A protein has these predicted regions:
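Intrinsically disordered, low-complexity segments enriched in Gly and acidic/Ser/Thr residues
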Residues: 77-124
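Structured domain cores in non-transmembrane regions
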Residues: 11-92
Length: 161
């Protein structure tokens, strides 16, 4: 239910964080502008540390994720990522497979989009494993290609907001 990412700035000049949400349209990832949000640091991230959290808001396969962030430079913040299309998926036979970034985000690559989580849905009761690489190489992901709905969440540590 809870996925956490620890990050550290290691003298980063990042001044903010942008979270992105992408929806698979059958051929490419489309950015959901309504689900994109950013946070501005009170100072540059510097050598600061923090945690990004994805927490499922319920037990249903298509439950919303609440994205939270905790950092001395950014404070605490949480936002629920809602999707009417995902919420309307039929519950009978619905399965979800999740892939997550598996390592701490150290030595931040500023202004680089980092995929943190990919989630794919099927309605035939089967599960196809998915990897985080499905965001950058969806054409090589059977799970994304055969999904009825897929979403990806990313983060960008930014020089300017």
């Amino acid at each position: 239910r809870l996925i956490e990412y620890n990050f550290s700035g290691h003298r980063s000049e990042a001044e903010g964080v942008l979270f992105g949400c992408y929806i698979w349209d059958g051929s490419t990832w489309q950015k959901d502008e309504d689900a994109t949000f950013g946070l501005r640091c009170s100072a540059t991230l510097g050598s600061g540390k923090g945690t990004i959290k994805f927490e499922r808001d319920g037990d249903a396969a298509n439950a919303n994720y609440k994205i939270g962030m905790d950092s001395p430079q950014l404070g605490g913040y949480a936002q629920v990522m809602d999707s009417p299309e995902r919420n309307s998926l039929p519950m009978e036979g619905l399965t979800a497979t999740v892939a997550a970034w598996e390592e701490p985000v150290n030595d931040l690559a500023v202004d680089t989009e980092i995929p943190l989580l990919v989630r794919v849905f099927r309605t035939d009761g089967t599960i196809i494993p998915v990897s985080i690489d499905a965001f950058l190489e969806p054409e090589n992901s059977k799970a994304v290609q055969k999904s009825v709905y897929a979403e990806a969440y990313t983060v960008i540590f930014c020089y300017e907001m």
